[in-house]
């Protein structure tokens, strides 16, 4: 029998101290009497999407050619599905949920005020870099760590100043699945891009010059990655440009693809253009204009016109965490053709040539995580199923594949291949694993031929690795 509050000893409630009951979450009221021109940013409305009714949050309101348009994010759906819609698709008969009023800002404490004054007097290098790039949204001031004013004397937060609501607010994420992002970065700013023979609809915001955002489509050269607002400008540029491949060293070539290595310091403009292009399809990465610390490995397809970019991954020249990939992308028009897997395979081929193990930088995008998990599983299962590989430890697998032991262990646990037998853990090839291997043999997957790799690990001096050398 359940106990009522009066039945509990010492006047205590069931699981809660008296007088400390949690405040119930506010109920969002639906306003049924709203005109279409009264809608503003933050409102949640019902929208027709592919013949179905969806709840969407308005991120932007704009008049385009005399017509009212809304840029919306569909609640509980991936941000890449955000789109600009006409006012006619909004169903006001089901009501509108207004945005919650902004919370009043709390006054800063004495210590916080002093720290804020010091930051204004001595801005860090990173803040100066961010301020100089006007078109590039940076992190909020609260999220930027000022190394010059960082306290390392072991001070801790006073428990009396702990605020439960503030701590919960830090953990919340919005439709972009990122914390403390600028509102402008939530709205996709380009409608379409023309890249070679492909017309592509971007997925996310990228800080291209603001004058380009007013165009219905922009033109991007698939060799130089330069961008133009009009077709005439683009055609004039192409008639004069002679570049027909990424501006780096070709380190790999087979019958299908080539790989080029580009140094971010030596080809700043090209690499910055590559970052702008990739940001249109990556939401989880922060874009900075400092490309000097990175090497870019670009995969291309060849035809009579030249080498066309398929995808790329970047890699830090010196990674303290042992990452072999910083950012990886296959362009949308080439996805689901095995090129993403080939990029991953090439990154591990470089790690093998270096004699190191490596892992991609976290966090990965949703598509990137799926690709890596599939690659890890197929590579490990194929290795274990080979004849003569009767006994292998996790360290042996990591050494052969150039994967970290953490990634190997995670993959073995995911496929239930770790068993406890006679006082020790063993790797067991289950029936499902064997079936997966049989299916894998039937698929014709592209692989990197290490014999065709013409590359030696680059060596950099301490001066070359320094900021802005």
Swiss-Prot record:
A zinc finger (C2HC MYST-type) spans 218-243. The modification N6-acetyllysine is found at residue 285. The active site is at residue 361. Keywords: Acetylation, Activator, Chromatin regulator, Chromosome, DNA damage, DNA repair, Nucleus, Transcription, Transcription regulation, Transferase. Autoacetylation at Lys-285 is required for proper function. Residues 1-26, 98-163 are annotated as: Disordered. GO terms for molecular function: chromatin binding; histone acetyltransferase activity; histone H3K4 acetyltransferase activity; peptide 2-hydroxyisobutyryltransferase activity; peptide butyryltransferase activity; peptide crotonyltransferase activity; transcription coregulator activity. Its main location: nucleus. Residues 185-457 form the MYST-type HAT domain. Residues 11-21, 130-139, 150-160 have a biased composition (Polar residues). It comes from the Eukaryota. The keyword Nucleus applies. Component of the NuA4 histone acetyltransferase complex. Catalytic component of the NuA4 histone acetyltransferase (HAT) complex which is involved in epigenetic transcriptional activation of selected genes principally by acetylation of nucleosomal histones H4, H3, H2B, H2A and H2A variant H2A.Z. Acetylates histone H4 to form H4K5ac, H4K8ac, H4K12ac and H4K16ac, histone H3 to form H3K14ac, and histone H2A to form H2AK4ac and H2AK7ac. The NuA4 complex is involved in the DNA damage response and is required for chromosome segregation. The NuA4 complex plays a direct role in repair of DNA double-strand breaks (DSBs) through homologous recombination. This is Histone acetyltransferase ESA1. The gene is ESA1.
